[in-house]
A protein has these predicted regions:
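N-terminal maturation segment of proteins
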Residues: 1-559
C-alpha cells in the first residue's frame, strides 16, 4: 500500500496542517491510512488542548485561500467543544479501525489502550464541575459501553496475556469513568429503558450558546438555526401529504388501516427478510444493483472497494439501521465498510424495500462519494478536501439523501423500458416478489417518503433540542402526532444525533441544494451520470466552495 499521490502535491501550509492533524487527531489519521499513527490517541488535557489551539491558530495565519481558512476554523471550533461522551466514542472508533485494518496487533493495541486510559483521566479532570443533562449522561454511558464492548471482543479473541492485562486495566478505567455519569436503570441503553426516563424528566440540553457557532464554523452551514428549522418545517408540511397519499394507496391494496405504522408493519410481513438472512440478501443484491446504478445514476472508480458486515453488538446503539465508514483515503487503496444492523431492539431494515434503501444510501451515496473523491475519479479535490473532516458530513449525506429520490425515479423508468438488461430484470424481480409492478413502485415510494419525512424531523429535532425549545420526549410526542411514525422509530432515528451536535440537518439541507443544482444541470443538457459523477468526486470542501465548483462545472459543460 502506497501513499495517495495527492500527498506529494501538498502546499507548505497543508504540510503544516497535516503534521498538526497527525498529532492532535492521530486515530483519525490512522483511519485515513497514516500507518505511523497506529496505537496513538490524543490526550485532551487542558494544556494539550491549549497547545493544539495555539499551533492551529499559527497555521491559520499562513492560510492562502478561503478553503484552507474555513477548514482550519472548523477544527478550531471543534477543539473548544468538549462533552463527556466524546473520548469513549473516539476510542471505540480507534480500536475498531485497528481491528478492521490490521486485526489484533498486540503492540499497537497495548499502546492505544494506554493512551485511551490517559485520555479518560484527562477528560475527567477537564470536565469535572458542570452539571450535565441526563441525556448527555446517558449518551456517555452508551459510548462507554461501546468501548467496553469492543474491549471484550478483543479479549475474547487474543491469546496475548500482556495485551489482556492492558485491556483489563483500561476496562476498569472505563467502568470508573462510566460511574461519573451513571444513570440508574440504564443497562442495555435501548428505547425501552431510556424513553420512560425522558418522559419523566423532560430536561432541556444546554447548547443554546454554542449551537449557532457549531453550525456555522464547525459544520459549515451557511444557514442559521432558524433558517434550518423553517426549511425543514416547510418540507415536512409539503411532503407529508405525499406520504399519506402513498400510505392510503398501499393500505387499500393490503386491506389494512391507512396509517404509516400499520402499513410499514404489513410491508414487513409481506416483503420481510428474516433477520438472519438480511446481511446475505444485501451482499447478493449489491452485485446486481451496482451495475444498474453505474449504468444509470453515477459512474464508479475502478478502485472501488466496499465490505459489508453486520453491525457489531457494541455499535448498535449508535447505528440503529445502517451506516458506512471509510478507510485509507490517504493511500492508493481506499475502502469502505457498510454496516447492516439486524438487532430487533433497534430499527433494522427488515423488508426488501427498506434493505434496498439502506443499500443505495450507504453504498451508492456514501461509499461511491468517498471512493470517487479519494481516487480523484472525475474531479481534482485537494489534500484538505479528501479528508474526513466535519465538512464531509453535510456533503456526503446530502448526496445520499438525494440518491434515494433518484432511485424511485429510476424504478419508474425501468418498468417502462421495453428491453431490460439481465441485471435490470433480476433486480426488478427481487423488488416485485409476488406483487404487481404498481404495488412494487408504491412500496418503494412509501419507504423513500417515510425516510424523507424522518430526515426533515431530524433537522427540526437538532434545532429544537439544541436551541432549548423542546425536551426530547416533547419532540418525539409532537413528531409522532404530526407524522404517524412510531415513537420508537422517531426516538431511534434522532437520539443518535445527540453525540454529533449539528449533524442531523445535513441530509435534507444539502440534499435540497444538490437537487436544485442537478435540475439546473439537466436543463442545460448535462447528463444525470455526468453531473452525479462529478459531484461524487469533488471531495469535501466548505459548502460555499462545493456549490461554487458545481456551478462552474455546469457553466463549462452546458450545451
Amino acid at each position: 500500500m502506497k501513499p495517495n499521490p495527492i500527498l506529494s502535491k501538498m502546499s507548505k501550509v497543508e504540510k503544516q496542517f497535516f503534521e498538526w492533524y497527525k498529532e492532535v487527531d492521530p486515530s483519525s489519521a490512522y483511519t485515513d491510512g497514516v500507518s505511523e499513527c497506529a496505537g496513538k490517541f490524543f490526550i485532551p488535557s487542558k494544556q494539550n488542548l491549549a497547545v493544539a489551539e495555539n499551533k492551529l491558530r499559527n497555521i491559520l495565519k499562513e492560510a492562502k485561500n478561503k478553503g484552507q481558512r474555513r477548514l482550519f476554523k472548523s477544527y478550531l471550533t471543534s477543539l473548544r467543544f468538549n462533552e463527556p461522551y466524546m473520548v469513549p466514542s473516539h476510542a471505540t472508533n480507534a480500536f475498531f479501525a485497528h481491528l478492521v485494518k490490521e486485526g489484533i496487533v498486540s503492540e499497537h493495541l497495548k499502546s492505544l489502550a494506554k493512551k485511551v486510559e490517559e485520555a479518560l483521566d484527562a477528560y475527567a479532570k477537564l470536565l469535572p464541575d458542570k452539571k450535565w443533562s441526563i441525556e448527555t449522561r446517558i449518551v456517555t454511558c452508551q459510548t462507554t459501553d461501546q468501548l467496553l464492548g469492543i474491549l471484550d471482543t478483543i479479549l475474547a479473541e487474543t491469546k496475548d496475556e500482556s495485551l489482556k492485562k492492558s485491556l483489563n486495566v483500561l476496562k476498569q478505567k472505563a467502568l470508573k469513568y462510566r460511574k461519573l455519569y451513571e444513570v440508574k436503570g440504564i443497562k442495555q441503553g435501548d428505547f425501552s429503558e431510556i424513553y420512560p426516563i425522558l418522559q419523566k424528566t423532560r430536561e432541556k440540553i444546554k447548547h443554546k450558546t454554542i449551537y449557532p457557532q457549531l453550525l456555522a464554523d464547525m459544520w459549515g452551514y451557511p444557514e442559521t438555526s432558524e433558517e434550518i428549522e423553517n426549511k425543514a418545517t416547510f418540507w415536512l408540511e409539503k411532503e407529508l401529504p405525499s406520504l399519506k397519499k402513498v400510505t392510503s394507496k398501499l393500505a387499500k391494496i393490503y386491506g389494512v388501516k391507512p396509517t404509516v405504522e400499520i402499513v410499514a408493519e404489513e410491508l414487513n410481513k409481506r416483503k420481510g427478510i428474516p433477520i438472519q438472512q438480511a446481511l446475505q440478501f444485501v451482499k447478493e443484491t449489491r452485485t446486481v444493483a451496482q451495475k444498474i446504478f453505474e449504468k444509470n445514476i453515477v459512474r464508479i472508480t475502478p478502485k472501488y472497494e466496499t465490505r459489508v458486515i453486520e453491525t457489531p453488538p457494541y455499535l448498535v446503539n449508535m447505528i440503529p439501521t445502517a451506516a458506512m465508514s471509510n478507510f485509507n483515503s490517504l493511500t492508493d487503496k481506499p475502502f469502505n465498510v457498510f454496516f447492516v444492523t439486524t438487532d430487533p431492539r433497534f430499527s433494522p431494515s427488515s423488508s426488501v424495500p427498506d434493505l434496498i434503501q439502506s443499500l443505495l444510501h450507504e453504498e451508492y451515496g456514501h461509499s461511491v462519494n468517498f471512493s470517487n473523491s479519494a481516487t480523484r475519479f472525475a474531479a481534482n479535490p485537494t489534500f484538505l478536501e479528501i479528508m474526513s473532516s466535519a465538512f464531509s458530513t453535510p456533503i456526503t449525506d446530502g448526496i445520499s439523501f438525494h440518491r434515494e429520490f433518484e432511485f424511485v425515479k429510476l424504478l419508474e423508468k425501468l418498468v417502462e423500458k421495453k428491453t431490460l438488461s439481465s441485471e435490470e430484470a433480476a433486480f426488478l424481480k427481487t423488488l416485485r416478489g409476488e406483487v404487481d409492478t404498481e404495488t412494487m413502485l408504491l412500496e418503494n415510494e412509501f419507504v423513500m417518503q417515510k425516510w424523507r419525512i424522518m430526515r426533515f424531523l431530524r433537522a427540526i429535532f437538532d434545532v429544537r433540542i439544541n436551541m432549548e425549545k423542546q425536551s426530547i420526549a416533547d419532540f418525539v410526542e409532537w413528531a409522532h402526532k404530526e407524522t404517524g411514525l412510531s415513537k420508537k422509530m422517531i426516538y431511534n432515528q434522532t437520539w443518535i444525533f445527540l453525540e454529533t451536535v449539528g449533524y442531523a440537518p445535513c441530509y435534507s439541507i444539502v440534499g435540497d441544494v444538490i437537487r436544485k443544482l442537478q435540475q439546473c444541470a439537466l436543463k442545460k443538457g448535462i447528463s444525470l451520470q455526468d453531473f452525479n459523477t462529478y459531484v461524487s468526486s469533488l471531495g469535501f470542501p466548505a459548502r460555499e466552495i462545493f456549490e461554487q465548483k458545481i456551478n462552474e462545472f455546469i457553466s463549462r459543460h452546458a450545451k
